[in-house]
Amino acid sequence: MTDPISDFLTRLRNASKARQAETTSPHSKLREAIAAILKAEGYIADYKDGTDAAGHKTLVVALKYVDSAPAITGLTRVSTPGRRLYYSYQEIPRVLNGLGISIVSTSRGLMKDADCRRNKAGGELICNVW
C-alpha cells in the first residue's frame, strides 16, 4: 500500500456512503490521531482498537449519521506521497469558508486548522473534511 492515509480516508468515505454502522482499518498512530480529531469535531461517533482474524491490531470506527444522512459530507486527501503540500499557519486555506476542517501534521502532532492558526504552527496539510 503506497498511501495508508488515503486508504483510511477512502474506507471512511465509502462506509459512510454505504450507510454502514462502522468500518475497520489497520491500526497506526497516525490513523488513530486522525480518528481522534474527527471524533472531537463530531464527524464520527467513536473509535476503538480491535483485532482481526489474523490477530493484527485494527482501528474500528463507528460512523455518525444526522437525520439518516452521513455526518461526513466530503473528505479529500490534499497532500499525497507524490506531492507533499506544506503551509505556514497563515497560508492554511479555510474549508468551505470555515464550515469544514483541515487536518494538518505539525511538529507538535496532528491539529485541525484553527488550532494551527492559534498555536502559530504550520505543517503538511493531510486532508479536508466537511
Curated annotation (Swiss-Prot):
SUPFAM superfamilies tied to this protein: Ribosomal protein S8 (SSF56047)
Disulfide bonds: none
Pfam families: Ribosomal_S8
Example of a GO biological process term: translation
InterPro entries (UniProt xref): Ribosomal_uS8, Ribosomal_uS8_sf
Tagged with keyword Transcription regulation: no
GO cellular component term of the entry, any: ribosome
Organism superkingdom: Bacteria
Alphabetical keyword list: Ribonucleoprotein, Ribosomal protein, RNA-binding, rRNA-binding
GO molecular function: rRNA binding; structural constituent of ribosome
Family: Belongs to the universal ribosomal protein uS8 family.
Functional summary from the UniProt entry: One of the primary rRNA binding proteins, it binds directly to 16S rRNA central domain where it helps coordinate assembly of the platform of the 30S subunit.
Record text on subunit structure and interactions: Part of the 30S ribosomal subunit. Contacts proteins S5 and S12.
HAMAP family, per database record: Ribosomal_uS8_B
Protein name: Small ribosomal subunit protein uS8
Originating species: Opitutus terrae (strain DSM 11246 / JCM 15787 / PB90-1)
Lineage: Bacteria, Pseudomonadati, Verrucomicrobiota, Opitutia, Opitutales
Gene: rpsH
